Amino acid sequence: MQIFYKSPFRKFVKKQTRSFQLIIEDEVEKTTISPDMCASKKGDLVEFRVHKFFYGKQEFLIAYRFQEAEILFFTIGPHENFYRELKRYLREAG
């Protein structure tokens, strides 16, 4: 299975501490092992799945798209304004 990362995902991870980067790496690995564990979103984000995890007391979300042989990670961030930022990125990249 091939794994690809979009630039917002890479930029967010690059700015974080090493300990948080390792946790993100573990969460990405969990997602690649069973990519269909998360439910698909509804509405205009229907092709995306979102994986949720906690770091400290903060909830973070990872948005990804899963197809037969590849996983494409789009963005990662705290729950606050997450879907708004994802939609903005899709409009600008669109």
Residue ranges of model-derived segments:
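Arg/Lys-rich, positively charged N-terminal/basic patches that mediate binding to nucleic acids
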Residues: 1-27
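Active-site micro-motifs of SAM-dependent methyltransferase domains
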Residues: 11, 30, 81
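Residue-level detector of beta-strand structural context in well-folded domains
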Residues: 1, 49-51, 62
